[in-house]
Amino acid sequence: MSQIISESLTALSSGQDLTTEQADAVFEELFSGEMTNAQAGALLMGLRTKGEKAVEVAAGVRAALREAKLIKGINSPCIDTCGTGGDGTNSFNCSTAVAIYLADMGYLVTKHGNRAVSSSCGSADVLEDLGVSLGTTVNEARDVLLRDKFVFMFAPNYHPAFGKIAPIRKELGIPTLFNLMGPLLNPARPTHQILGVGRPEILRLMAEVLVLTNVEKAYVIHGAGNFDELTPFGVNDAILVENGELTEVKIDPADYGFAAAKPEDVAVKDRPEALATIRKVLAGTAPQAMLDMVALNLGAAISILDGVSLEEGMEKAKAKVAKGVDKEY
């Protein structure tokens, strides 16, 4: 056992946070394959038991990205919309709809995702059904983005190192730091992000990690109803990340003219309904609660991309969602 692994596991066993140097070194060993499965399991369990801190999550992100297939040459602002998942809500795929609306409006969207976590369909499931390729390679991604304003990067294709860690995660059988890292590992390194969390206690943690991983501007959101998106069910909690500063924000749908709704208004019961619903959402013909939920998240994205107020972003979003996207799906 290397000295850094020994020091780190000893610290975690007594409930101590890892230093930046320890965290960087230990995750480098994890992703390089120098750590045994037993040591990796002890590391992940120790972090989970103690409670992960931003420095530790950020170190994991940096190490994972060093092993990832990164997209080069995107020299313009771009955005990802995603959540940690696991909120158990069985809602329609709002974040993917928001991404498609943004691209339809001319913003560059670098969508990074996987198959279903908490919904009936994950972003990959939905986009595959809409005809979007899941096989875009690292060499193709930039050109696809500049041509279509949208590129989807299917996570397993860009993070081969995770294949070595998957068996350990499966054996542990509990959420670990890797569940937090997922939304932070976009290989295109977007400048902007809408990041949803299903648990309010990790709202600030994820915002702090975005600062440490150099995202320029973002909203980290925890929606009313314990959703990992802004919802029209009540007041939503959010943190604006900008220039390394964190600002807590309450986003009340009523302030922007949205009618109150309930979680069941945005639920889908199975995969076929989820796939049919996304088409209605993109056409602007879905139930109003779903369209409002898309507009709320779209408005937040527009506000950080355009550098305008939430009110201006919401108005622009509502007008767009009312007519649907220009492309037919």
Curated annotation (Swiss-Prot):
Q: What is this protein called?
A: Anthranilate phosphoribosyltransferase
Q: Which GO terms describe its biological process?
A: L-tryptophan biosynthetic process
Q: Name one GO molecular function term.
A: anthranilate phosphoribosyltransferase activity
Q: Where does anthranilate 1 bind?
A: 83, 114
Q: Does the keyword Acetylation apply?
A: no
- Annotated positions binding 5-phospho-alpha-D-ribose 1-diphosphate: 83, 86-87, 91, 93-96, 111-119, 123
Under the cellular component aspect of Gene Ontology, which terms does the record hold?
cytosol
Task: State the reactions this protein catalyses.
Answer: N-(5-phospho-beta-D-ribosyl)anthranilate + diphosphate = 5-phospho-alpha-D-ribose 1-diphosphate + anthranilate
What does the note under cofactor report?
Binds 2 magnesium ions per monomer.
Q: Keyword Magnesium on this protein?
A: yes
Q: Where does Mg(2+) 2 bind?
A: 228-229
Primary enzyme class:
transferase
Annotated gene:
trpD
Residues that bind Mg(2+) 1: 95, 229
Q: Which organism is it from?
A: Maridesulfovibrio salexigens (strain ATCC 14822 / DSM 2638 / NCIMB 8403 / VKM B-1763)
- Cofactor(s) required for function per UniProt: Mg(2+)
- The superkingdom of the source organism is Bacteria
Family classification: Belongs to the anthranilate phosphoribosyltransferase family.
Tell me how this protein assembles.
Homodimer.
- What is the role of this chain? Catalyzes the transfer of the phosphoribosyl group of 5-phosphorylribose-1-pyrophosphate (PRPP) to anthranilate to yield N-(5'-phosphoribosyl)-anthranilate (PRA).
What residue ranges carry the coiled-coil annotation?
Answer: none
EC assignment: 2.4.2.18
Could you say which residues bind anthranilate 2 here? 169
Please name one Pfam family that this protein belongs to.
Answer: Glycos_transf_3
Pathway given in the UniProt record: Amino-acid biosynthesis; L-tryptophan biosynthesis; L-tryptophan from chorismate: step 2/5
Keywords attached to this Swiss-Prot or TrEMBL record, sorted alphabetically, are:
Amino-acid biosynthesis, Aromatic amino acid biosynthesis, Glycosyltransferase, Magnesium, Metal-binding, Transferase, Tryptophan biosynthesis
